[in-house]
Design a protein with these regions (language model features):
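Acidic, Mg2+-coordinating active-site environments of NTP-dependent enzymes
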Residues: 143, 160-245, 262, 266-282
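C-terminal helical cap/extension that packs against the catalytic core
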Residues: 201-220, 309-312, 318, 351-410
Length: 430
């Protein structure tokens, strides 16, 4: 098989949550444990940090990976979803797993795993852990796919667990209250493994504290003693932070929501500092300043061009848009133009209520079966006095926005990681 044929096989022969939604979700770790045993428990050959949460997992995971790389470690990074290439999910020191390794994994192992009927994520997790062990990474940042307690990454025993925040998402699997969702996320809290909680409310704090007490695990709430004292936009891009323990740091990632992520990361760094894993403050500054270069991160308030300024961002739910909407509203420009689409398991009405009413909209739909039809998005937008035209693809919507824009305008592309993925994929092909 070619690489493209291999990726198509993975997507078409295993249930993929990003494509089909609920039918791809599997409760339980039975298949994961069978795969893990077959590959001789690869996750036991490297240290790990486990990252769960509704929003901010990707930014926190990539920033931690960058800091650890700057410290001199060989670092594995497992995240989802990908934007352009499947291999983005599995990286070592910012380098994606090779196409040949993906091909070999499927060709050599399919006779074993096909009778198990694994989900896409179960198979991808097995590939990631196997790759990290073979590459002899020192430490891996492992991002939870969905939930925590029953997520197939939850076979690891990390040196640190992180839960970024909790909001109402994937309620059909995780529960329809913050407390119920927190209980699922708290499933990654392990016996005597410290856990950092990025953001919380009383309803979730109770759950996290109870689980940590049961596991005799140190629990640290990042908001109790904030590691970030203040922040402001850096003139050369990104955000400048004044920190409690590490002086002034410039973070490469833009977007007002990154202050919360930075606070979570720095609180986690303090735990790693106490363990002797991180020893140099210079590594922290270097990691923050070079996240994209060191890890290949895309889609976080990512600048695609200037004049007109074009920004894309993968924020896709109420929690993410709480910050994104304010950032967009504050953006100085002649006219805001927003290319927007969403998928059908998100609260379209809640996000619509946050969108700026002074923008011109280009309603579209990403190329996933889970997408809200662009016509449905436009129809819902009418209820909020938001107006624009409908486009059948993200690229068509983006090209229309570019054609309409003056140099002083601001174009934002987002609403879903799949919208951003479609755009970046199309731009790469041009």
């Amino acid at each position: 098989m070619t690489y493209q044929e291999t990726v198509e096989y993975l997507f078409n022969s295993t249930p993929v949550f990003e494509h089909v939604g609920a039918s791809a979700y599997k409760e339980g770790l039975e298949t994961t444990k069978v795969l893990d045993e077959h590959f001789a428990h690869p996750h036991t050959h490297f240290l790990s940090i486990h990252v769960a949460g509704t929003n901010g997992k990707g930014s926190c995971s990539h920033t931690l990976a960058a800091i650890l790389q700057a410290e001199g470690y060989k670092v594995g990074l497992y995240t989802s979803p990908h934007l352009v290439d499947f291999r983005e999910r599995i990286k070592v020191n910012g380098e994606m797993i090779s196409e040949q390794e993906v091909i070999d994994f499927v060709e050599q192992e399919r006779n074993f795993f096909e009778p198990l009927h694994p989900s896409f994520f179960e198979l991808t997790t097995a590939l990631a852990f196997k790759h990290f062990a073979e590459q002899k990474v020192d430490i891996a940042i492992i991002e939870v796919g969905l939930g925590g307690r029953l997520d197939c990454t939850n076979i690891i025993t990390p040196i640190l667990s992180i839960i970024t925040n909790i909001s109402l998402e994937h309620t059909q699997f995780l529960g329809n209250t913050l407390g119920a969702i927190a209980a699922e996320k708290a499933g990654i809290i392990k016996h005597r493994v410290p856990v950092v909680i990025g953001e919380s409310v009383p309803e979730t704090q109770i759950v996290f504290k109870a689980k940590a007490q049961k596991e005799d695990a140190l629990i640290v709430f990042a908001e109790d003693i904030p590691a970030v004292l203040s922040s402001h936009p850096n003139p050369d891009g990104g955000i400048a932070y004044q920190t409690r323990f590490f002086g002034n740091i410039v973070g490469e990632l833009g977007g007002s929501y990154q202050e919360k992520n930075a606070n979570t990361v720095l609180t986690a760094v303090m735990q790693l500092y106490n363990k002797g894993v991180i020893k140099n403050a210079e590594s922290i500054a270097k990691g923050f300043a070079n996240v994209c270069e060191l890890t290949g991160l895309m889609g976080r308030w990512q600048k695609l061009q200037a004049n007109p300024l074009v920004i894309c961002d993968t924020g896709h739910n109420v929690g993410g848009w709480t910050y994104l909407s304010q950032q967009i509203k504050r953006q100085p420009c002649k006219q805001k133009r927003i290319v927007f689409g969403m998928v059908d398991d998100k609260d379209l009405h809640a996000v619509m209520s946050m969108l700026p009413d002074d923008a011109i909209y280009y309603w579209t739909q990403p190329s996933t079966h889970r997408a809200f039809p662009a016509e449905k998005v436009a129809e819902t937008a009418d209820d909020y006095d938001l107006h624009g035209k409908v486009y059948s693809t993200v690229l068509e919507a983006y090209q229309a926005a570019l054609q309409d824009a003056d140099e002083q305008d601001f174009i934002f592309v987002g609403g879903s990681s799949y919208v951003v993925a479609d755009l970046l994929t199309s731009l790469q092909k041009k």
